[in-house]
Amino acid sequence: MTILSDVKALGQQIWLDNLSRSLVQSGELAQMLKQGVCGVTSNPAIFQKAFAGDALYADEVAALKRQNLSPKQRYETMAVADVRAACDVCLAEHESTGGKTGFVSLEVSPELAKDAQGTVEEARRLHAAIARKNAMIKVPATDAGIDALETLVSDGISVNLTLLFSRAQTLKAYAAYARGIAKRLAAGQSVAHIQVVASFFISRVDSALDATLPDRLKGKTAIALAKAAYQDWEQYFTAPEFAALEAQGANRVQLLWASTGVKNPAYPDTLYVDSLIGVHTVNTVPDATLKAFIDHGTAKATLTESADEARARLAEIAALGIDVETLAARLQEDGLKQFEEAFEKLLAPLV
């Protein structure tokens, strides 16, 4: 048993927040799955880094540039191939759990963040292009993205709803998911294969707030917010309204902790993994955090510990005049901008 297997036994999946051709072709990803990794996430920044630093793309980039394709089409050709290959590596994991684990995420273009219909169309196209049952399409959790989530779920597509910082927005996402499931059931279609994760970002919250907080609260907000979001999750998915859908085969949305590498070197490097282990959750971790957790992390069900203390911390923060929902909206906008910039950098060498 590895520590990752111990975490899985506690009800949480650990995913790798990284993807590149070398990672797949070297067998490194397969080795990580043997250690207990259960899935993979990607984003424009990850692909930008991969394309720039992985020599295995050079020949394909040159060949694609000779074809009459747009830079975005060239990017998608390579990204879809990588996600498909990663899906194949993760397929045995996916099948061993009846389709509950082993997913690989590919994100829609950041420029579609405020365009619900455009998001739906691109998500459908990418899902068809990957053509793997363990592919997950990543959609930003803007109002438009949440509208798209409802449609995509009713289409039977698994979704990673990303860039969540707000508990209120997360609850809106659960309701959209439930509506999508209800539509699909009303049409007499199966829902058992549909998995949705709600990616709630952690370290960026502390990075944004710590400078304004007294020492006793530094590095505490993100974990307190995540614990409160998990309580919201428990209330929503144990309520009779969702139980009726669950009885017809619907899965619960899983909270996925994202941005769990520490940004402040003063904090323990496994802080945002050790502190957020709980049932029906996922933590997607960058390579360095994964290695650190395997080396010296702690597998213990911590997510439901000190819930009263978490609420008290959030109350203290509110008493200081800090509105975490206003902060959440700003952080989501910042995150969208970062992905747009990464996408532009990604496409520039493909012109």
From Swiss-Prot:
Please state where this protein is localized: Cytoplasm
Using the UniProt record, name the top-level EC class of this enzyme in a single word.
Answer: transferase
Q: In which pathway does it act?
A: Carbohydrate degradation; pentose phosphate pathway; D-glyceraldehyde 3-phosphate and beta-D-fructose 6-phosphate from D-ribose 5-phosphate and D-xylulose 5-phosphate (non-oxidative stage): step 2/3
Please provide, in alphabetical order, the Gene Ontology terms of the cellular component aspect for this entry. cytoplasm
Keywords from the UniProt entry:
Cytoplasm, Pentose shunt, Schiff base, Transferase
Q: Does the keyword Cytoplasm apply?
A: yes
Q: Briefly state the protein's biological role.
A: Transaldolase is important for the balance of metabolites in the pentose-phosphate pathway.
What protein name does the entry list? Transaldolase
Biological source species: Neisseria gonorrhoeae (strain ATCC 700825 / FA 1090)
Q: Which gene encodes it?
A: tal
